[in-house]
């Protein structure tokens, strides 16, 4: 009887460890990023572009990971309200931040600053979420 209890306890501990490992793996997945051209002529015409793919992450998980990684996180709301468009004045260093949902799998965020504008486009597909960031200087 003690041997059965030992094996059941060991199995329970091993199973709990697997769940914890898979949960933390999803949280610690590094995004795969690529940047567009960085010469100033291109940036003034098209903006400074960066595209990052977050594998196996939902839009909300990606938003939180992106926000957490940024030093200017105060310019993004702490939480999302899926499907609800919002305009927020004077959030962090911004003049205005707009959240516009284009369906449940697409979110467009526009941050207006005194010195320019930054856009974030979140697009979800079955393999994860892509975020395109475009910074437009004045």
Predicted regions and their residues:
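Bacterial N-terminal signal peptides that target proteins for export
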Residues: 1-10
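Short, exposed beta-strand/loop patches in secreted or surface proteins that constitute
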Residues: 95-102, 122
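Short, hydrophobic/aromatic-rich segments at coil-to-beta transitions
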Residues: 101-110
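Short, low-complexity, Pro/Ser/Thr/Gly-rich segments in the mature regions of secreted, periplasmic
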Residues: 125-138
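Flexible low-complexity loop/turn motifs enriched in small/helix-breaking residues
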Residues: 26-92
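Short, exposed beta-strand-loop hairpins at the edges of beta-sheets
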Residues: 109-127
């Amino acid at each position: 009887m003690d041997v059965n209890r030992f094996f059941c306890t060991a199995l329970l501990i091993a199973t709990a460890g697997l769940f914890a490992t898979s949960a933390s793996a999803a949280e610690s997945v590094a995004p795969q990023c690529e940047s567009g051209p960085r010469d100033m002529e291109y940036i003034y015409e098209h903006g400074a572009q960066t595209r990052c793919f977050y594998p196996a992450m939902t839009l909300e998980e990606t938003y939180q990971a992106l926000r957490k990684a940024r030093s200017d996180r105060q310019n993004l709301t702490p939480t999302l309200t899926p499907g609800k468009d919002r305009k927020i004045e004077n959030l962090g260093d911004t003049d205005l931040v707009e959240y516009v949902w284009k369906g449940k799998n697409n979110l467009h965020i526009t941050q207006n600053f005194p010195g320019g504008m930054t856009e974030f486009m979140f697009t979800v597909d079955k393999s994860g979420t892509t975020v395109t960031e475009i910074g437009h200087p004045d």
